[in-house]
Amino acid sequence: MLVGMTALAIDFSDVAAAAERLAGVAHRTPVLRSRTADERCGAQVFFKAEHLQRMGAFKFRGAYNALVQFSPAQRRTGALAF
């Protein structure tokens, strides 16, 4: 993953920590399947229905995870999203 121009390595512990921060905050959304997509791709295709997340925002998990990790100085400055 790139942040600015810096490459960041993400491992399972990062994913587990993010899941812990999101526990009880993010809705559990379903994973959907499509036989048509499977046939066209020649593989099993899974769709995570994040559009069913709070506020219909598919980026809720990432945004929330980033905001709760803000330092006190970053919290005073705030965040802008569009």
Task: Report each predicted region and the residues it spans.
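PLP-dependent amino-acid enzyme catalytic core
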Residues: 2-82
